[in-house]
From Swiss-Prot:
Major site of localization recorded for this protein: cytoplasm
Pfam family for this entry, one: Abhydrolase_1
Upper classification of the organism: Archaea, Methanobacteriati, Methanobacteriota, Stenosarchaea group, Halobacteria
The protein's name in its UniProt record: Homoserine O-acetyltransferase
Binding site for substrate: R226, D363
């Protein structure tokens, strides 16, 4: 059901649209693809900005005062960036965020009802980032939105944004890729693989067939997967500052694995308590099969697939680009963003690589809006010439080969 709310300075659309038959990259066809979106502000024909959400994010990119019973990235996950008077100013722009296929916030995915009236489960077609982009394009067509003023994405949403520059290069004027990369490295691929195995090893997963009130969900496996994710999203420095080796005290929570009798002798540390809390909250809001589907889509993405190089993949894109990276992010490093900036430069595409000094790890793009907002807002308004936009290139327009991106942490597990 479509809902539109209008308050001073803010208009919000929230809807789920049936875009009809949709063929996935795998060749499988869904007869009726449902796509959930939210849009903020007024469309004037030229001011549309598409925001691509992160792995477990939703279309609820900004708050509108009516959310209840949701948490994490399901609820206003970038509310300090999107809204009236903010970096993506909804007084000026028509900001759209689309829940991607395979997710579980209204767009068709494994938990959605299939043709037989039962949830799809693992019979749902495999999804790729390319599938996300094409579904977004069809949703925008339905809304009457043609060329986009900007596409903005963080984390895997940045990969989604990059895919727009490849699949629909003429449809994007400005591209902002925040805390992302052209592909995952082998360490992140390995961590994602272990996270998926945590889910599929949970007896309650049952081959993906766990839906129904009379069945238990694989919450333990999904929780472990989320805990791995949180370790990947934080930096060593931020974890040490936040938790250290402090004991949380057992209280009523106990250990995550109470069957281990030796655990009673040892302290239950604050970092464990934090991870257990995050696991519990995540299992309440997210679907385990969706986590499998979306991590595979992220792992599969490679900007240069089908091309000789990243630069060749971007050759048709003539718009301006902003890359934002964070020095403490080892999930998507500053070096990866600099390599991507080099690909844009090799095809003479206007690009700025803005490096943010931060020790908050990958989560910095969510938790430090005061550092992300100014360059992002100025770029969307003014392009790479925006006042708050900096670049790693020298005055001559070439990258500074001597640039050090300290303090980069290559891994939480380095010695």
């Amino acid at each position: 059901m479509s809902r539109t709310r209008t308050t001073p300075g803010r208009r919000v659309e929230s809807d789920v649209v049936d875009i009809g038959e949709h063929e996935f990259e795998s060749g499988e066809i869904l007869p009726d693809l449902q796509v959930a979106y939210e849009a903020y502000g007024e469309f004037d024909g030229q001011n549309a900005v598409l925001v691509c959400h992160g792995l477990t994010g939703s279309q609820h990119v900004a708050g509108h005062g009516t959310e209840s019973g949701v948490s994490g990235q399901a609820r206003a996950w970038w509310g300090d960036i999107v809204g009236p008077g903010k970096a993506l100013d909804t007084n000026d722009y028509y900001v759209i965020c689309v829940n991607v296929p395979g997710s579980c916030y209204g767009t068709s995915g494994p938990a959605s009802e299939g043709p037989d009236g039962e949830p799809w489960g693992t019979d749902f077609p495999p999804v790729t980032v390319h599938d996300w982009t094409r579904a977004q394009r069809r949703l925008l067509d339905h809304l009457g939105v043609g060329r986009l003023h900007a596409v903005v994405g963080g984390s895997v949403g940045g990969m989604n944004a990059l895919d727009w520059a490849v699949q629909f290069p003429d449809d994007v004027e400005r591209l902002a890729v925040v805390a992302s990369a052209a592909r995952l490295d082998s360490q992140c691929l390995g961590i994602d693989a272990v996270a998926r195995r945590a889910i599929t090893s949970d007896p309650n997963w049952n081959g993906g067939d766990y839906y129904g009130e009379d069945r238990a969900s694989p919450d333990a496996g999904l929780g472990l997967a989320r805990q791995l994710g949180h370790l990947m999203y934080l930096s060593k420095d931020s974890m040490e500052r936040k938790f250290g080796r402090r004991s949380a005290g057992r209280g009523d929570r106990g250990d995550a694995f109470p069957s281990d009798p030796a655990a009673a002798f040892f302290p239950y540390r604050e970092v464990e308590s934090y991870l257990d809390y995050q696991a519990e909250k995540f299992a309440e809001r997210f679907d385990a099969n969706s986590y499998l589907y979306l991590t595979r889509a992220m792992d599969d993405f490679d900007l240069s697939e089908g091309y000789e190089s990243d630069a060749a993949a971007l050759a048709a894109f003539e718009g301006e680009s902003l890359l934002v990276s964070f020095t403490g992010d080892w999930h998507f490093t500053t070096e990866q963003s600099e390599s991507l900036a080099g690909a844009f430069r090799r095809v003479d595409a206007p690009v700025a690589h803005h490096v943010v000094e931060s020790d908050h790890g990958h989560d910095a793009f969510l938790v430090e809006p005061e550092k992300v907002g100014p360059p992002l807002g100025d770029f969307v308004d003014e392009g790479v010439a925006g006042r708050a936009v900096t670049d790693t290139a020298t005055d001559g327009g070439e990258p500074d080969e001597e640039k050090d991106f300290a303090p980069v942490h290559s891994s939480l597990f380095s010695r």
